[in-house]
Curated annotation (Swiss-Prot):
Residues bearing a lipid moiety (N-palmitoyl cysteine): 23
Species per Swiss-Prot/TrEMBL record: Staphylococcus aureus (strain MSSA476)
InterPro entries: Csa (IPR007595), Csa_sf (IPR038641)
Family: Belongs to the staphylococcal tandem lipoprotein family.
UniProt protein name: Uncharacterized lipoprotein SAS0401
UniProt lineage: Bacteria, Bacillati, Bacillota, Bacilli, Bacillales
Lipidation (S-diacylglycerol cysteine): 23
Keyword Membrane: yes
Membrane topology: Lipid-anchor
């Protein structure tokens, strides 16, 4: 009987040891994702463009090559599309957003786009209110092509800065404990990271935009398309500062490379 008790105790210790080792292993994986994990792959996919941040001179993109596939026609050097948009709910049931998109054609070495001011409504049937102003990039400066009555708005557009012009993701590889969402049938991949208000990129966003919430934001790295690269899908960054209905606040940004004929 005494022998059986010792045997049972020994087996229990072995099982407990295996369980603890398993937990430690899972914890290490969460904090330090393996090279082949989906989190590591998402970071690697984003690093192809984020390593270029900050892009001080947008016209440098004319000389930057991006991911190419069969969607490109022979001789097409491709087009970079860059966009930054800030959205905030200032009234119940309304969302106001402003932002700019530019298409930098590497064949023609021209950059055209528009600045958009938009208000969307939760109320069913109420139409979105939107105003677009055509712009172009000349000597790394934004030039407004449409007449803008509001002098302050014109100045705001001309001095607009894309997130990619001042953001820095050199430490992206050190971001830990990402919340990963995957649907390989679509396909899409997403990694979410809690960022502190002391984060350099967060500080710069708070300086540039009317972010009233004190909450620390969630950074989303979203890939729509092949995680290894595709000119059909897109990659987008989003900083979500608040999801509260009456104070929803976020900034979205993307830099993508694709065939020129798609613009």
């Amino acid at each position: 009987m005494e022998y059986l008790k010792r045997l049972a105790l020994f087996i229990s210790v072995i099982i407990l040891t295996i369980f603890i080792m398993g937990c430690d292993s899972q914890s290490d994986t969460a904090e330090n994702p393996k090279e082949g994990s989906k989190e590591a792959q998402i970071k690697k996919s984003f690093s192809k463009t984020l390593d270029m941040y900050p892009i001080k001179n947008l016209e440098d993109l004319y000389d930057k090559e991006g991911y190419r596939d069969g969607e490109f026609k022979k001789g097409d050097k491709g087009t970079w599309t860059i966009s930054t948009d800030f959205a905030k709910s200032n009234k119940p049931g309304e969302m106001d957003s402003e932002g700019m998109v530019l298409h930098l054609n590497r064949n023609m070495r021209t950059a055209t786009g528009h600045y958009t001011i938009r208000t969307t409504y939760d109320e069913l049937g109420k139409m979105t209110r939107e105003k677009n102003y055509r712009v172009e990039l000349k000597n790394n400066k934004i030039v407004v092509l449409d007449k803008v009555e509001d002098v302050n708005l014109k100045h705001k557009i001309e001095n607009f800065k894309f997130f990619s012009q001042y953001a820095d993701f050199k430490d992206l590889k050190n971001y830990k404990n990402g919340r990963i969402s995957i649907n390989e049938n679509v396909p899409y991949y997403e990694a979410e990271y809690k960022r502190n208000n002391s984060d350099g990129n967060v500080k710069k966003l708070r300086e540039k935009y009317p972010i009233t919430t004190k909450q620390s934001p969630i950074l989303k790295l979203h890939i729509d398309g092949d995680i290894k690269g595709s000119s059909v899908g897109y990659k987008q960054i989003e900083y979500m500062f608040s999801k509260e209905k009456e104070d929803e606040t976020f900034m979205s940004d993307f830099l993508n490379f694709g065939p020129s004929h798609s613009n």
